[in-house]
Regions:
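Extreme N-terminal starter segment of soluble prokaryotic enzymes
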Residues: 1-13
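Conserved N-proximal alpha/beta basic substrate-recognition cap immediately N-terminal to
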Residues: 16-130
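Short acidic/polar capping segments at secondary-structure boundaries
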Residues: 97-98, 125-129, 151-155, 165-167, ...
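ATP-grasp fold ATP-binding core
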Residues: 111-112, 138-157, 178-193
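Phosphate-binding site of ATP-dependent enzymes
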Residues: 160-247
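A short glycine-rich, hydrophobically flanked beta-strand micro-motif that places a catalytic Asp/Glu
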Residues: 249-261
């Protein structure tokens, strides 16, 4: 891809500006520290960047995808990520790998087969939504209320957390049209240190970080080594590593709850294009700054490692 290309970037990053500049600045900083050039593909530039990329005028050795719509193949960011993968750019994460992992209906049976604890689930295809009826067996399996999620949904859009009947499927489908919907038993986390035992675990090219994530208030706090030991939270790492091995994903987070019975249940399987809003910018829903910085560093290191191997 290098012959005839006017401009080559070591690392490009797609971004929809749905976070603050802290993560972007840390990526830029770490690139500068290890002598990688960098380009931020913002909405204002994406059409032109795509055109130049398509015509072979620019190329990126690595592309960090922080924004593309899996459910909208016509989306310009989606098309750019696919084009980059076709042009042998190292994409974090490759679009086919990311889509397969992000598709909850597709991943759910694989997790079950791998003996990873997930909520009891019924999968309903879009074509069945209008005429679907819960059997008595279904009602026992799901309990009441139960949760409904679109297979390719994110950001809670289309999620119904207080479903009581099949009629609630229409609410989810109206909010987020999708090919499939998951009806799931609602998992209630136990309480530890006056907070829900609910965690967001980040996997970034073999490195793992753990956050307490309050599923009722959205607040994050990094788990300490002492807490990991005191509360027996070591299974969190094993679970996220198994999910990484199963999916082939290199950068994602998983939401995991611990129940009163002590079981660790994976609630939200794979979140790619992780939310990197910093806590200093938004204390209510932001990720701790030191964690955002550490993830940015590991991503840049991984890009450099791949570039070195490719040369």
């Amino acid at each position: 891809m290098i012959r005839g290309v006017v401009r080559i970037y070591d690392l490009a990053m797609t971004h929809q500006l749905d976070a603050d500049d802290f993560f972007i600045h840390r990526v830029q900083q770490h690139c500068a520290e290890i002598h990688l050039n960098f380009f931020l593909v913002e909405p204002v530039w994406v059409e032109r960047f795509y055109d130049k990329f398509e015509r072979g005028k620019v190329w990126a050795r690595a592309l960090l995808n922080m924004h593309s719509e899996h459910h909208q193949p016509e989306d310009i960011f989606h098309r750019l990520v696919r084009l980059a993968a076709q042009r042998k750019t190292f994409v974090i994460d490759p679009p086919d790998v990311a889509l397969a992992a992000f598709n909850k209906a597709r991943l759910h049976p694989l997790l079950v087969a791998a003996d990873i604890q997930v909520p009891a689930t019924i999968i309903v295809a879009r074509e069945q939504v209008g005429g679907f009826a819960l059997s008595e067996e279904h009602r026992v399996l799901l309990g009441s209320p139960f949760v409904i999620k679109p297979s390719l949904g994110y950001g809670r859009r289309g999620v119904v957390v207080d479903a009581t009947s099949e009629r609630d499927l229409a609410r989810s489908a109206a909010a987020w049209p999708d090919a499939e919907y998951l009806l799931q038993r609602r998992i209630v986390p136990r309480t530890l240190q006056h907070s829900p035992a609910y965690f967001r675990v980040y996997f970034v090219f073999g490195a793992v970080w753990f956050c307490w994530w309050n599923c009722y208030t959205d607040r994050y706090r990094q788990a300490t080594a002492a807490e990991m030991a005191e509360f027996g939270l070591q299974p969190l790492e094993e679970l996220v590593r198994r999910i990484a091995a199963l999916t082939g994903m290199n950068f994602f987070s998983s939401e995991i709850a611990q129940t009163e019975a002590g079981e660790f249940v994976v609630i939200d399987y794979v979140n790619d294009q992780c939310h990197m809003l910093s806590q200093s910018a938004n204390p209510q829903i932001g990720v701790p700054d030191e964690l955002v910085a550490a993830i940015a560093r590991r991503l840049v290191e991984a890009a450099k490692e791949n570039i070195a191997q490719a040369r």
